[in-house]
Amino acid sequence: MRALWVLGLCCVLLTFGSVRAEDEVDVDGTVEEDLGKSREGSRTDDEVVQREEEAIQLDGLNASQIRELREKSEKFAFQAEVNRMMKLIINSLYKNKEIFLRELISNASDALDKIRLISLTDENALAGNEELTVKIKCDKEKNLLHVTDTGVGMTREELVKNLGTIAKSGTSEFLNKMAEAQEDGQSTSELIGQFGVGFYSAFLVADKVIVTSKHNNDTQHIWESDSNEFSVIADPRGNTLGRGTTITLVLKEEASDYLELDTIKNLVKKYSQFINFPIYVWSSKTETVEEPMEEEEAAKEEKEESDDEAAVEEEEEEKKPKTKKVEKTVWDWELMNDIKPIWQRPSKEVEDDEYKAFYKSFSKESDDPMAYIHFTAEGEVTFKSILFVPTSAPRGLFDEYGSKKSDYIKLYVRRVFITDDFHDMMPKYLNFVKGVVDSDDLPLNVSRETLQQHKLLKVIRKKLVRKTLDMIKKIADEKYNDTFWKEFGTNIKLGVIEDHSNRTRLAKLLRFQSSHHPSDITSLDQYVERMKEKQDKIYFMAGSSRKEAESSPFVERLLKKGYEVIYLTEPVDEYCIQALPEFDGKRFQNVAKEGVKFDESEKSKENREAVEKEFEPLLNWMKDKALKDKIEKAVVSQRLTESPCALVASQYGWSGNMERIMKAQAYQTGKDISTNYYASQKKTFEINPRHPLIRDMLRRVKEDEDDKTVSDLAVVLFETATLRSGYLLPDTKAYGDRIERMLRLSLNIDPDAKVEEEPEEEPEETTEDTTEDTEQDDDEEMDAGADEEEQETSETSTAEKDEL
């Protein structure tokens, strides 16, 4: 009887436990429905329920409330440029849709940077929500993806302006750059983030985008769009965010893969692991937990115990409840970027792949960097920095050079992002360098303008430049010549012109073409190593192309004697060399100017003086008579071997190449006094005494210095030398006339012979092809003849009447 009573009691207990389990299922099911996640996972405890309530809700409104909300919302049309831009993004990036998440997280990070910066001077800025995070949640059941940040948020006006008009988005420039990239066949995905239009990439995967935002200075609003138009309305739920923005994407059918946790996690790690704020993903994991055993299981286990001594000891101790280990699936926010800021870690602990991944993350580039340097500067100011040289030059690198801010150096103070809008963080010529600078010595609670004038920034700038030049210097020669110089060579030349304190360092980075090799470029160090034994100058020749420079009459004797000549073929090259007075103790010599001299023996000197005396009549005649108003003086040349003559500038005058450049600039800006002055400077006319034309001219001048033919020949030689020396002729028509006159004389044609007049053309008779047309013409002629006869008869009668 007693056994039956015990058995009945056990049944009651089992039934009660079953009811409790069913109740727990119902409670957990409600929580799951609220979160929009799968019902297949194990149930969660009360602590997790509280965390789930912090998860992002879709609307908190039923279907009828949502419909009413949309009916009352204010409708807006996108600007035409924004509409065009969205279509361009969707059409050009459809194969790289995943970048939408990178852009949304990047925008969230920017919003967090802004509120953190505001909080430095406004202690109430974080009152609505002190947490600075990005949270991502997938809702498979409702086909929704949420991205929430606790950043600065947007007011109603900002929602309209930032997400619907061109004023804030940089759309116009983006469209131009996008078109250029497509024409060049280059990747366009990195352009999205660079021009602040990354938000619109959400439409790559979403049919509809809903933005809920709360700014400290406004109530919470909802922005909604299907890419055709957008609407904005006050959120009837009130302030559910505290502060920040939630972007909800209603995903397209083919984009359902972005609701998979593994996909989202991989994308966050791929693109955003170096974001400076924690990124959480609402995800599940399996945990092993201890649960109390039921009484029947516990009793069974006790019976299986065979150790009597253990049993005795257990009886003596206070009996503990029996437990068992079970696996349970729980949901929680999982941190995806728990990596310490890479620049705060010792460089020895950072792998090469980590640097590359960080570069791509913060620069929004798709290629690996060409070079990088990670260092800690100590002394007057302490800071940590990582600097990168990109593989290719940014688009528009020299557009409005010096007037546009550089966005490539990000300044942090005590890990707090301050700005990327400093004009003087790096010199203009290093505007391609990207990186971060983090200092503990700069003040936090001051304005950007005040910080920009801080004396420590000048110290930081100086060290950044030195480290950048060290980084560039370490690039391997082959990679430097083939890649770096092609992309950034002009920047180095501008640095020589602008940066006096680092001119010597920059000079070692210069590369030019030279006569040493038909295609390879050379450094100045290599040139100096190859100089002839008694050569004391570095020779260079400037021209619009290598072909023009190496065919110039100025390099004839130099090349024949085995001297190497550097060819300057870019407009900035001659400015660069002028700013560099010497290199390694060797001065530069422009071979198109006065001052080119060669070592000569005593006998050579005597021969030269004898030749000068022999040609003195011709030289004086040219200077005082034939070319009186055109040249400063005429001399026997030491640099010509094949050409009859050349026009040489003074040491302070302009070469032909420089004059051409300056005149082109003058036409754009309007001529100034200095341009006119240098352009009007007379030059030295050098003649080649061994050339047959010059020798014959000497003979003719000795015979008759008033011979007009010889005078014309002298002027033609001067004008030809002007062109061959790289200068422009002021009167090309007169030059053409003189050439024609010389040709007439060479062909024994009378200089005054006129051009034959063209004969007058007689009107052509038209012949009709068809018989019908001919007959019609005959009829018309007969009618016309009859009319003429009648007219003559009438005129005759009138005349007779007049006589009577």
UniProtKB/Swiss-Prot annotation:
Modified residues (N6-acetyllysine): K479
Pfam families documented for this protein: HATPase_c_3, HSP90
Motif (Prevents secretion from ER): 801-804
Modification N6-succinyllysine, positions: K404, K633
UniProt note: domains: The SRT pseudosubstrate motif associates with STT3A during translation in normal conditions, preventing glycosylation of facultative sites until HSP90B1 folding is completed.
UniProt similarity note: Belongs to the heat shock protein 90 family.
Protein name as catalogued: Endoplasmin
